Amino acid sequence: MPGLNSVLDIGKRALFAAQSSIEVTGNNISNVNTPGYSRRSVRLEEGMSIDYAPGQMGTGVEAKEVLRHFDTFIEEQYNTKSSNRERWDTLLSNLKNLEMVFNESGEGRLNEAMSKFWKAWQTLAQSPETESTRSALLGDAETMLNAIHFADQSMNTLQRQMGDYIKQDVQRVNEIIHEIAEVNKQIDAHEIEGRNNANQLRDERSTLVRELAKKIDINYIDNGGGDITITTGAGQTLVDGTETFDIKYEGAQAFNSTIPSSDFDGSINFEGKSDYEYTFEVFEAGDVENDTASAPYPPKMKISIDGGETWLRDENGDLEFVYARDSKVTVPNSDLQIWFEDYSSGNEALEVGDKFTVVPKDGLYWYKTSSSKENITPLIKANGESHERRVSEGSLAGYFECRDHYVGRYREKMDSLSKGLVWEVNRIHSQGAGLSKFSSVTGSYSVKSDIKPLGSDSSGLDFRDKFQSA
């Protein structure tokens, strides 16, 4: 029955509600500069009513819960842009270091060394019998080689630095996803929907998600409470509630991906390093064998360096091929050699559509289970876009892109320049004569087998592709 006590109770509840609001407001003010803090407010609700004549009588106000003001849509947009920004910031800072390798403002740089080298040849051509001009050419040649070696070593150092940064990022990503899973567990333990919101834990989780987005592109799905799902931008799950899935930075390796009807039970092996990732797809079926000189020929495979989006072609626009053999075969325009072995049941037949992936470099892998993994190493397609099933944003993507797509390509061009220079200089020089006649000549290169054609992959010659039919 309404009376003085009811009035006092209404006043008491109003004071408690106001006190709660003041405390929350004070907490907001004190944390105005706290990173990751979200503004909070008290949700007030009318107290229960009592049936009484002439009508229901109210019992005042109640502070029901403390709400966290957080816009999920804006947060998702922020994390997406943060991933993109970190990728380009990482690229920018490291490409500046690459730019310094080719800075021509100092002494002994590559351009200056090459200019002196060619001038020394011109001087020698005018007076080839002079010992001093010959010595000057040798000195300038050594200077140029030192400049080339310095540039290559500097780029190699940059790539090793990228590898160290990648290791650090991978370690931190795994730490973050485990921390998020632990916070999810705590949220489930403390939160009671509509009564007790774990706002501090939610802020902590959001801060971790923001940090994760800087490392790797992510998608975030909030199913309520501690039940959230975080995947990579390509869809690989990193966090599912309290369950986690790690990523790992591992060494060079190869994978089989045969079609369902294929009985091939061997494996592809490789030797050598490359900044490319190679995909080989069987174009003409057959049995893996050693001899390519007569029919039936071994399987013929086409080659891709962008995950099978496009296929390598020669200068005439025709597809480049490599044979699938059980002896080493050199992949065109590379230092990579591949071969097939380990046939557990003797099935050496390859079918059209069988695929093999060779990653002759350190790469990034997502583990669904301890024995099931997926290659998520960032990969740039021929059109310049990132591969949709790989990591494409965040600092991890920036480091990989700098290491493989930029520094790696420059090293490839430098290597091609060096090989072309060596071949042309030696070819022209071999047509001349020294000041004294030779009594004997020993070649710098040797063949692996004296029964293999000199221009074949099996010859072992570094310049086998230079041989021409008479």
Question: How would you describe each model-predicted region?
Answer:
Residues 1-470:
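Structural signature of extracellular appendage/secretion-system components
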